From Swiss-Prot:
Residues 660-685 are annotated as: Disordered. Essential cell division protein that coordinates cell division and chromosome segregation. The N-terminus is involved in assembly of the cell-division machinery. The C-terminus functions as a DNA motor that moves dsDNA in an ATP-dependent manner towards the difSL recombination site, which is located within the replication terminus region. Required for activation of the XerS recombinase, allowing activation of chromosome unlinking by recombination. PROSITE patterns: FTSK (PS50901). Residues 673-683 have a biased composition (Polar residues). This is DNA translocase FtsK. One of its GO terms (biological process) is chromosome segregation. Homohexamer. Forms a ring that surrounds DNA. It is a multi-pass membrane protein. Keywords: ATP-binding, Cell cycle, Cell division, Cell membrane, Chromosome partition, DNA-binding, Membrane, Nucleotide-binding, Transmembrane, Transmembrane helix. It comes from Lactococcus lactis subsp. cremoris (strain MG1363). One of its GO terms (molecular function) is ATP hydrolysis activity.
Amino acid sequence: MPAKKKTTRRNTKKELQKKAATRKMIAFFVGLLLILFALARLGIVGILLYNIVRLFIGSLAIILLLLVAAIMILSVFRKQFLKENKRIIPAIILTFIGLMFVFQIRLHQGLNETFHLIWSDLTAGRVIHFVGSGLIGAIITEPAKALFSVIGVYIIAAVLWLVAIYLMIPGLFPKMREDLHQRLAKWKEKRAEKVEAKKAVKALKKLEEEKEIPEPQTILPEAENSLFTSAPVEIPINIPEAPFEENENPVLEENPVDDEPVNFMNTNNYNGNYKLPTIDLLAEVPVKNQSGERENVRKNIGILEETFKSFGIGANVESAVVGPSITKYEIKLATGTKVSRVVNLSDDLALALAAKDIRIEAPIPGKSLVGVEIPNAEVAMVGFREMWEAGKTNPSKLLEIPLGKSLDGGIRTFDLTRMPHLLVAGSTGSGKSVAVNGIITSILMKALPSQVKFLMVDPKMVELSVYNDIPHLLIPVVTNPRKASRALQKVVDQMEERYELFSRYGVRNIAGYNEKVQRYNAESDEKMLELPLIVVIVDELADLMMVASKEVEDAIIRLGQKARAAGIHMILATQRPSVDVISGLIKANVPSRIAFAVSSGTDSRTILDTNGAEKLLGRGDMLFKPIDENHPVRLQGAFLSDDDVEAVVTFIKDQSEAQYDESFDPGEVDENQVGTGASNTGSGDPLFEEARNMVIIAQKASTAQLQRALKVGFNRASDLMNELEAQGIVGPAKGTTPRKVLVSPDGEFIGGVEE
């Protein structure tokens, strides 16, 4: 009987061990299965489990789950591994704590915000937000950050990782220390060798110099009075002094004013009594309270993320920047998401946000983010006085102008001398005229009349007429389109004359010439005036192109190519940005552009070579694309009232009267003369003048010749030939022979001469 009881107890023990092992294996597989569900976020259970883990350790959940799975597998299949490597678990714990510090610092949120982020994902059954290291991370990080600052927390994390590395690889640091000592010893040896080598070289050079000293002492006295020694003595003295004394000052003295076509000697020097307008002349614009936009931003962030999710796009709103008229949301796309998918959703996003219109910047230059620009419910007006005070332009840069306020609240300025020409386009009511007035007013508030001159063209006769009679004007504001084309040609002539002047004095640009004049005035009693900068402003380019397109285009192209060094800059404005107004040659020579609100993407591409201006809101909302940037920048232009402009102009007029330069006077024009525009009375074909000049120079005319030279069809060439005959330029047709040209290259009529 005792033997049977003993056997029964042994069998019961083995069965208990088997049952325990079975329970362990079941628990192992169930736990591993749940971990896999959580890692893959499969279904409601997987997302719920993952979010529960995230509640405590945040976005480190995936790392913790993988570590737990690895430890479970090792504990079942390699039990001795953990016993043999007891330092692994403490090392893993220290590494994990360091990661918790770093992840929570990256979140930039406290305990309450972290809990709300995780709880929103947990209740919504989703995994979207980056939540740092969860509640545990927030609990341990916030006190550490308060005690040691953010940098201190990073240092603590780095120390924990170093300790973890030491625990896992005990021999690593001693080995590194030995290697460092060996390398340091080798470096010291090499340095000592180099020092010894340098000392030896210096000693050898010293010995050689001591040996060579007697030789020059015996040669120099013999050659002291020779031609060979006298030349080197004279050359160093004469080279720096002779060109300046003999060439520079006499050039300025020997060239009288009469030899220089335009030297602006008829322009008074206003530097003595003239005072610049002060900021007190401008009215203050009350600051708009945009506190309500913060609530709108929070609401829009949720709408954006939900909309992206509904279209199957993984995207998070990283940040939002509230500007004067729009708010820019910076979107982080999931890896593998095409940017074009977001761009194509612009209408759907506008519908979801109930926005007037939105603009998508994909991607934001310099960032791996996509920008979504949404209009604000409350638009904050930017005052010109506020912008001028905050812009803080350099007083020595006369053409540095504050343009508008960017999204981050900074004032964007531009230097017209670097642009060097500017094209401004926008539909009626977009803020184009206000921007042009702001540019003019900015220059008037910085520059003396002797420093900057304006030539203004205003075919509409109402935009720039307020500036008449200011001393900065070269001539009164030009309102006749035909006179405007002549005035532009006068500016081209002035540019050529300035280049001749630069060539005569050996300078490259207006800055070099004015610097020479300043040096001359400092050394001579006879004073010369510096050349002023010239700013040509055309308020409506379309009107000029309709009347005299070829002359205007030629003048703009020539000024665009060469005028920068001569100190001449253009600002061309139009409210009809079509290709017949802004031609390809004009765009190529006017590289800096400002686009206000336009009606279509075609107009936007005409101005900026890209879409976007059709999405602008108007009232000063603009896209600025300077010459040195590849992407346009969105700005809110400043509001400048008519009263402010009138106050500045009146202040200037009260100090001095305008003294116009007759050399820029376009003179009288015949309103019925034949031009090259679309509305010419002599010919309806814009190629008529080109055809006329061609046949007069060639002294022969045929329809086939016009076809080849002008690249037009037979019908158009035939019409041109008939028009030339009607104008008395060519004779009648005589079979297949070319027509006779009745005007000589000198312009004389030779119709009566028969060969």
